[in-house]
């Protein structure tokens, strides 16, 4: 009888402790949600009339928000933070619907995306913003191929009068580690089927295989063809005309870009700021929200 009561009491205590733990967990979750909602409400931004959404790519746009302190070692001065692609796209969608935001101003000097697919997704989001009837203004001192691909969607593309164009097409750099691993005495046993299964080639080869070269070239060509088609449509030139300019290394400076209708205006940074002030009816750039 004594053993029965002990067993019953132990079961009761165990159940009570479990229920108590569950209740604590529920209260903790409810408290966290309440805190999160309160925090979001307190962080709501009131946008002033005639505001501008400025995009300067100070943080890399990645698939997800992240903070990587090691990036500050490899890239001195970098913040180590990245902005999630979804958050960046949502900001554009909100701006398109907000009557207080007049247009987007985009500085394309340091276009920084984690992947080419993220870059393409963001350009598509800019295109949707443009479809809302609001303008996009793009500026850069110097245009790279990714930077110009993004800028070309803008209603007005501006470039520094003494800027340079580094639009040379696309390429890829592959790393091979066989010699390095051999020196470390590390042997790699790679199991694969088919010559196009090249994910492990970097560990067993010192050079790119013909099959891997073929598939990489196909991928790069497909991406470039897609970019050029979008650029040509935005700038109202033909695909062949743009490819010829790139192939002949015609685009080297701002004058070349202007001559071939790839930029609309040549301005210094302070002139662009004055132009934005005019559009927003403000006296100085510091007053532009």
Predicted regions and their residues:
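Amphipathic alpha-helical
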Residues: 269-271, 275
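Small-residue-centered hinge/linker elements
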Residues: 2-238, 243, 247, 277-289
């Amino acid at each position: 009888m004594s053993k029965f009561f002990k067993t019953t009491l132990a079961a009761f205590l165990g159940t009570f402790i479990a229920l108590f733990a569950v209740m604590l967990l529920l209260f903790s979750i409810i408290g966290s949600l309440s805190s999160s909602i309160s925090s979001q409400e307190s962080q709501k931004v009131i946008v002033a009339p005639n505001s501008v959404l400025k995009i300067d790519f100070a943080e890399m746009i990645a698939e997800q928000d992240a903070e990587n302190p090691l990036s500050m070692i490899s890239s001195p001065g970098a913040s180590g933070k990245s902005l999630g692609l979804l958050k960046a796209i949502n900001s554009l969608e909100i701006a398109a619907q907000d009557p207080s935001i007049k247009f987007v101003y985009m500085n394309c000097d340091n276009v920084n995306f984690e992947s080419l697919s993220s870059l393409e997704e963001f350009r598509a989001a800019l295109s949707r913003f443009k479809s809302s009837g609001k303008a996009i203004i793009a500026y850069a001192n110097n245009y790279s191929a990714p930077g110009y691909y993004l800028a070309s969607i803008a209603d007005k593309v501006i470039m520094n009068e003494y800027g340079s164009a580094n639009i040379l097409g696309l390429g890829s750099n592959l790393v091979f580690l066989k010699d390095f691993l051999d020196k470390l005495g590390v042997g790699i046993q790679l199991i694969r089927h088919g010559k196009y299964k090249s994910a492990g080639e970097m560990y067993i080869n010192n050079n790119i295989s013909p099959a891997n070269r073929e598939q990489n070239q196909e991928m790069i060509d497909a991406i470039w063809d897609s970019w050029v088609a979008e650029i040509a449509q935005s700038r109202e030139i033909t695909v062949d005309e743009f490819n010829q300019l790139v192939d002949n290394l015609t685009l080297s400076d701002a004058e070349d870009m202007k001559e071939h209708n790839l930029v609309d205006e040549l301005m210094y940074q302070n002139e662009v700021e004055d132009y934005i002030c005019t559009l927003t009816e403000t006296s100085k750039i510091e007053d532009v929200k």
